[in-house]
Amino acid sequence: MSTSLLKLTGITRRFTNGEQDVTVLKDINLTINQGEMVAIVGASGSGKSTLMNILGCLDKPSAGDYQVAGRAVGKLDNDQLAELRREHFGFIFQRYHLLGDLTALGNVEVPAIYAGKSRLARRQRAADLLTRLGLENRLHYRPSQLSGGQQQRVSIARALMNAGGIILADEPTGALDTHSGNEVLSILRDLHRQGNTVVIVTHDMTIAEHAQRVIELRDGEVIADRQTRPEEATASSPEAASSPATSALNQFKDRFIDAFKMALLAMNAQRMRTFLTMLGIIIGIASVVSVVALGKGSQEQVLANINSMGTSTLEIFPGKGFGDMDASAIQTLRASDIQPLTQQPYVHSVTPSVSTSVTMRYGNIAVSASISGVGEQFFTVRGYTLERGVLFPRSSVDELTQDAVIDKNTRDKLFPHGEDPIGQVILVGSLPVRIIGVVSKNQGGFGSDENLNVWVPYTTVMKRMVGQSYLKSITVRVKDNVDMSIAEQRITDLLMQRHGTKDFFIMNTDSIRQMIEKTTTTLTLLVSMIALISLLVGGIGVMNIMLVSVTERTREIGVRMAVGARTSDIMQQFLIEAVLVCLFGGIAGVALSLAIGVLFAQLSSNFAMIYSSSSIIAAFLCSSLIGIIFGFFPARRAARMEPIHALERE
């Protein structure tokens, strides 16, 4: 006794055309048993293709009940319908519907990917099926390299891949010559003898007569249902596709790899369009990374300038602030303030400063130079490095010695032929001084680093050069791990107690550092926000192109759904493509930014862009996130398509 496999009861299908409803199928009642070979025949517009689409779960009836192997179809969601197509149906289309970027072997494997078969098992079965159909020498040919008959054989092999047992053939010979058409019909008869249920949809009664049973449709109604010949002896059930079970993780991995490969193929097929789409991401990422690197570089440069003044230092000046017109008349900042400051527990070192500009002579060389009177701790406070000789000690300050320390600029100017300056006597104004040491040039200090600097004990400058008893400034270096603001307040209290009034002001280099860090961070953030606009524009471009890609590949979407792709599979495929476009754009953008940094370093010797791993990682994450956000809507649009509408899309 035959087993009912496909059962339709009262099936009606209506379509809305503008304001008018068109009924394509009218109260169809059919039962197709397991192992039957049935032909559904009718003229164009009879509803035969619509009936096949409902049979294959590619379309849903407007009314009535449809069961597949006793399972009601009407209440199933899209993923359950996809599962039904994977497990029970194989489709043979008139126009083959092969994926052009895949080989014959790859096309046949597609249903097994969505069925969760292992890679080795599906590759072996696909090769076996193609070999049985006479394509053993065409396994790695693409559809464009195959004849129509060969493409249809690949389509048949794909239909058999999951061994669902039900073959739905829509005009399988319609696009073939007579010889190829007869070969396809012969294959279908062989499949029937092997126990497969074969349903052929055709308008040609000659083709229909090859079936055991012919169902005629006219204007959406069954007008005839007859046996053409007695039932042949067939296998009780079709050959099963045996394959080892795979874990859910491996199934997901295989589907992901397939989606990844298809994304790469799609990008490669439209290389120029892909590049132009990436361009917005490339420019955006390069802009953001470069701006951050530029901001970091400028911040480090400015902080280096501050450090050149001495780390953790407080500068004490007479007056109420820079630009105070009365500052020159204030003479209360004196050498006697140094000792009390030095004795404070939070103070590391103290150096006074008094300076003047004079003409400096050595032999027949005369130059203008800045003469600074400083204490013995000046070089420690400022962080200068001794290149040669010695620094003057405390005794030089006490004894008003005429010892001098010069910088490398002064050495190069006064001793251009490489003479050793140590022990040489130079004339500073009218005061002869003996050079005892050379310190390295101050890198990154405020002002020009080409100045000629000479340092002598401040007592010598005050008594023997400028004839004044007050100081221009005092620099205090605070010990490490001491809060600068607290130290500033303590020094303020101490000097106010000594002077009786606040006739001085203090420049806190730590406050300047914090202010500059905050300012550069704000500016970097501001410019980065501007650069992010280009990323946003690039993301919109990605979304636009992905929408175009979805439209162009609508038929591919339909084919994948027909062979069992889930909604998540379709969405994943297009989402991966969008993410890859943005990720590759991000990589190219970072590379472009690094190239800009190299070029910038060649053009600027004393300033460099500083890249951080965090900004580069953030760039990759940002580009991937853009791919996900702007790729989501096109991917969702693709995943929401109805299989039949996608297949019919030109």
From Swiss-Prot:
Residues 233-246 have a biased composition (Low complexity). Its EC number is 7.6.2.-. PROSITE patterns: ABC_TRANSPORTER_1, ABC_TRANSPORTER_2, MACB. It is a multi-pass membrane protein. GO terms for cellular component: plasma membrane. The chain crosses the membrane at residues 275-295, 523-543, 580-600, 615-635. Its main location: membrane. Residues 6-244 form the ABC transporter domain. Residues 227-246 are annotated as: Disordered. ATP binds at G42, A43, S44, G45, S46, G47, K48, S49. InterPro entries: AAA+_ATPase, ABC3_permease_C, ABC_transporter-like_ATP-bd, ABC_transporter-like_CS, MacB-like_ATP-bd, MacB_PCD, Macrolide_Exporter_MacB, P-loop_NTPase. It is an enzyme of class 7 (translocase). It is found in: Cell inner membrane. Homodimer. Part of the tripartite efflux system MacAB-TolC, which is composed of an inner membrane transporter, MacB, a periplasmic membrane fusion protein, MacA, and an outer membrane component, TolC. The complex forms a large protein conduit and can translocate molecules across both the inner and outer membranes. Interacts with MacA. Belongs to the ABC transporter superfamily. Macrolide exporter (TC 3.A.1.122) family. This is Macrolide export ATP-binding/permease protein MacB. The lineage of its organism: Bacteria, Pseudomonadati, Pseudomonadota, Gammaproteobacteria, Enterobacterales.
